[in-house]
Amino acid sequence: LETLEIKNPLVCTDPGLSSIGMTDKIRDLISNEISPTFYEETPANPTEKAVNEALELYRANDCDGVVGFGGGSSMDLAKAVALMANHDGNLLDYAVNEGGYGKITETMPMIAIPTTSGTGSEVSVGSLIIMNDGRKLILASPHLMPNAAICDPELTEGLPPVLTAGAGMDALTHCICLLYTSPSPRDLST
């Protein structure tokens, strides 16, 4: 946080991590000079409503950066907040299918702290948001890549087994998908 000159981050996380005390670990790690604000209502699939709520909290507390703490949903929400905190208009203006790729410029500083190992959102340039009308919105830009990712395997300990298994299946699915959809096919026997 200090390297990115973030003094007042918005931490986007979900109710599940809050309920098992994981957000307390973040509070314990942050120095006294940093005043985090927590948005702990990230849904299982981040929504336009959640982005707007988190963005309102970001602005009301004069935040200067974003931390995505949790699974892919929390990190995708953090990316959308980092984008909208530094851009005019609404999310739809920046959707890939609406020509928004080129409109995305520098976002607010962002750190990703994954607690699962499934989506890879901490090292990707994309974010998936469910709009209020049910459409899936894809945001994509190199500017959405987190400035830093803190990958600590100890953060995956203590998660419910079903979540760990689901994240593992997600990672496996990403690998299989890459094999079959890559523009340069590979021999699957190697």
Report the location of each language-model feature:
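Single conserved hydrophobic/aromatic residue that forms the stacking wall/gate
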Residues: Y180-T190
